[in-house]
From Swiss-Prot:
Pfam families: DNA_mis_repair (PF01119), HATPase_c_3 (PF13589), MutL_C (PF08676)
GO molecular function terms noted in the UniProt entry: ATP binding; ATP hydrolysis activity; ATP-dependent DNA damage sensor activity; mismatched DNA binding
Tree of life domain: Bacteria
UniProt-annotated stretches for the region Disordered: 364-384
Annotated Gene Ontology cellular component terms: mismatch repair complex
HAMAP family the record matches: DNA_mis_repair
NCBIfam families tied to this protein: mutl, PRK00095.2-2, PRK00095.2-4
Role played: This protein is involved in the repair of mismatches in DNA. It is required for dam-dependent methyl-directed DNA mismatch repair. May act as a 'molecular matchmaker', a protein that promotes the formation of a stable complex between two or more DNA-binding proteins in an ATP-dependent manner without itself being part of a final effector complex.
PROSITE patterns linked: DNA_MISMATCH_REPAIR_1
Gene (UniProt): mutL
One BP annotation, GO: mismatch repair
Protein name: DNA mismatch repair protein MutL
Key word Electron transport present: no
Organism: Rickettsia bellii (strain OSU 85-389)
């Protein structure tokens, strides 16, 4: 076959393959154009998830008949000139979207320029047969896309179900709406309104807060910290959830660069690192975080859909984001998720309240009580035997309680109003500490709470190089399940020595331990080494020092903490609560579960019909 020049329509269809993958891609490109046009109101109408019909209407600046004619040509744009390529502030700039969409659909554009008397429309079928005619229309633009991919039926076969395609489109609209709380959005599918968001006219922070409530939910705002960082060429703002308010997937993570939604690996890794001390690896925080950066320091032209970016100094951006999130979390470091308490209140609700008493039948005193089945909160990871801490609970000897908890408190009895977590009143099932504040009761998981306290204390010891070694009178020989675990411990022995653990290889599958951290006291060395070996084996051979420290600290803290089933005196319970009040991130254990639940008195009174 001889070399030949492709036709314009073929070129546009090829270009469409890079830019337009599904109906959501069409909606993204057209809504972004509407935003760039200065719209204050954008309406989206879909039929069959956009496969049959997509209509985007806006009240933006609009177009004249001459602008309409060239707008559907390749590489025509009002947003860019040759001298301004490194200073891009708009969503679109390549001039590819309209001709690419037109090449694979039946398109009708109707538009009226602001302050113009006349409106015009242009009709294209598969990118050809351009027809411009006068029309009747308000100021702004309306674009109708029918029979998407009719010109490329092979692409049509690759589309997913209507439900899946619709979900992708809703996600696109939500992201753009979050970035522009000043714009009103509506999304209708097959005659049903899915989204209706009113544009906000408040200050910037309150605009964003209200839009987040409308899109993500009020629960998120109640369980989130506000991020606010500013420098001459960089700023970060938004909301990120406290560690105990989390999800099983990353779907509710919204990241923006200069108001452009992105799925950037660098930012996602930074988010994960910021939470690594406070959350299980299979749980994800919720966030809506906006990075504003000088356009000359970020390249948005590295991906066909502009979903990825390239930073001039990626490490600077990464570290700045991590620090900003950690600073925001520290402002609410003692708080546990409010949804946990709400779920607990639901458990106590009496199904017979406000109902007529059933007096027609005598009470059967011999009937068996119904089984109590507690509900599971969707934000709390289920207890699983795979977590080393949970496996330890039944096998650990009595762990040493740190000196502050052991000391007797000689002061007068503590009053409920003195402290945020209140005064201890009782211990339930030798596992939960019940305390009372002025307007609530607090239920604390003693093992989870002390594990967090130990984690923070050991972490500080390691950071400040204050971890003291304790030589074992009789070195402990630990036999491991396989040679791999013994090897990985031995290969990291120098790093482990700095963390208070001295060991040597002893045969193919065994390790001999000569020193342990003094803070751990009289612990089960066999179990400590086996758990540590399991942790490191999961990470592979080339484990980084920071990750090693994380695993070691986590393992130490678990062995160090008060176990469930340990009876505590009133002084010990109060000492534990006071330590929690003075320790960062004591609202959640090392796995992201809450260490305490607070039940407000007003909610308890409502349960009994008092209010």
């Amino acid at each position: 076959m001889t070399i030949k020049l492709l036709s314009e329509s073929t070129i546009n269809r090829i270009a469409a393959g890079e830019v337009i993958e599904r109906p959501a891609s069409v909606v993204k490109e057209l809504v972004e154009n509407a935003v760039d046009a200065g719209s204050t109101k954008i309406d989206i109408i879909l039929e069959r998830a956009g496969k049959n019909l997509i209509i985007i209407s806006d009240d933006g600046v609009g177009m004249t008949d001459k602008e309409l004619e060239i707008a559907v040509e390749r590489h025509t744009t009002s947003k860019l000139d040759e001298t301004d390529f490194l200073n891009i502030h708009t969503f679109g700039f390549r001039g590819e979207a309209l001709p690419s969409i037109a090449a694979i659909s039946k398109m009708l554009i109707t538009s009226k320029k602001r302050d113009n008397q006349k409106a015009f429309q242009i009709k294209l079928i598969g990118g050809d047969e351009k027809q411009i005619a006068p029309a009747i229309h308000n100021e702004g633009t309306k674009i109708e896309i029918r029979d998407l991919f009719f010109a490329t039926p092979a692409r049509l076969k690759f589309l997913r179900t209507d439900k899946t395609e619709l979900a992708a489109t809703v996600d696109v609209v939500k992201k753009i709406a979050l970035a522009h709380p000043e714009i009103s959005f509506s999304l209708t599918h097959d005659g049903k309104t899915l989204l209706k968001l009113k544009g906000q006219n408040k200050d910037a922070e309150n605009n964003l807060k209200q839009r987040i409530i409308d899109v993500i939910g009020e629960d998120f705002i109640k369980n989130a910290s506000y991020i606010d960082f500013k420098s001459p060429d960089f700023s970060i703002y938004g909301y990120t959830s406290i560690p105990t308010y989390n999800r099983a997937s990353s779907e509710d993570q919204f990241l923006f660069i200069n108001n452009r939604p992105v799925k950037d690996k660098l930012l996602q890794v930074a988010l994960r690192v910021a939470y690594q001390d406070y959350m299980l690896r299979d749980r994800y925080p919720l966030c809506a975080i906006f990075l504003q950066i000088d356009p000359q320091l970020v390249d948005v032209n590295v991906h066909p859909a502009k979903a990825e970016v390239r930073f001039h100094d990626p490490n600077y951006v990464r570290n700045l984001l991590i620090d900003s999130i950690k600073n925001a979390l520290s402002n609410k470091s003692h708080i546990a998720s409010t949804t946990i308490a709400s779920s607990a209140i639901e458990l106590f609700k009496n199904p017979f309240v406000n109902k007529e008493p059933a007096i027609s039948k005598p009470l059967n005193v011999n009937s068996k009580p119904s089984k109590y089945r507690p509900a599971t909160s969707p934000t709390v990871p289920k207890y699983t035997p795979n977590n080393s801490c949970q496996k330890l609970i039944d096998t650990l000897p009595h762990a040493r309680i740190e000196q502050e908890v052991e000391q007797r408190i000689q002061n007068e009895p503590q009053k409920s109003s003195q402290y945020r977590l209140g005064a201890a009143k009782a211990q339930l099932h030798t596992t939960y500490v019940i305390s009372q504040t002025e307007d609530s009761i607090v239920i604390t998981d003693q093992h989870a709470a002390h594990e967090r306290l130990g984690y923070e204390k050991i972490k500080n010891y390691i950071k400040n190089e204050e971890l003291i070694k304790q030589r074992l009178l009789i070195p402990e020989i630990v036999e491991l399940p396989d040679e791999k675990r013994a090897d990985i411990l031995y290969e990291n022995k120098d790093k482990l020595s700095k963390l208070g653990l001295s060991l040597e290889k002893f045969g193919e599958k065994s390790i001999i331990v000569t020193e342990i951290p003094n803070i751990l006291g009289d612990i089960n060395v066999q179990k400590l080494i086996q758990d540590l070996a399991d942790h490191l084996a999961e990470c592979g051979e080339n484990i980084a020092l920071t990750e090693l420290i994380e695993h070691v600290t986590e393992t130490y803290a678990c062995h160090y903490s008060i176990r469930a089933g340990r009876k505590l005196s009133a002084d010990e319970m109060n000492a534990l609560l006071r330590q929690m009040e003075n320790t960062p991130f004591s609202g959640q254990c090392n796995h992201g579960r809450p260490t305490y639940i607070e039940l407000k008195l007003k909610d308890i009174e409502r349960l009994f019909g008092r209010k």
